[in-house]
Amino acid sequence: LSLEAIKERRDVIHEHGIKNVRVLDRTFNYNNKRAKELLNLFREYPDICFHLEIHPALLSDELKQELATLPKGLLHLEAGIQSLRENVLEQSRRIGKLSNALAGLHYLCSLENMETHADLIAGLPLYHLSEIFDDVRTLTEYGAGEIQLESLKLLPGTEMRRRADELGIQYSPLPPYEVL
């Protein structure tokens, strides 16, 4: 959507008194310039809390500075870590380096003006249960408000779904298409 269309929708949301908005964009900060523009739109209504998913490995210095200046309570962030295993991230074709993701998570968790949660995804290729438990323990050291463990969903049209047989992943053919 264009920034103008988003602004119009944001205004309608505000007019209706809605206080929590979940932005369904799994790559909110894939384009840091656009992310900054969106944050400036959100800043205009500090009485609304915007819930975003952010990729901590892709935080530019400029976006970090922008996040630090936002009003307290404007954002609730989910930091998409997915796994702390390089082989899992590589097999899943996750962009960004793990070291950058952890540095980004550390930065986000240090911000006192927003709540940050860390997300892990069970069911990723090569990701074993014992490793998930180890990763949860490791993430507790970062100070995230919550550590969320979600199951992998193979949505139609996604690369992971196209590669399911190759990766040995079985999933439900019915929504929400979770790994079995």
Regions inferred by a protein language model and the residue ranges of each:
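Flexible glycine/acidic-rich beta-alpha junction loops that bind and position SAM and/or redox cofactors
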Residues: 32-33, 81, 87-92, 122-131, ...
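Radical SAM [4Fe-4S] cluster-binding motif and immediate context
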Residues: 1-110
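Mobile, glycine- and charge-enriched loop segments
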Residues: 102-127
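Short beta-strand segments at enzyme active-site cores
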Residues: 20-25, 116-119, 148-149
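Short, hinge-like loop/turn segments at secondary-structure boundaries
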Residues: 39-41, 68-70, 135-136, 164-168
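Catalytic cores of alpha/beta
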Residues: 62-67, 125-143
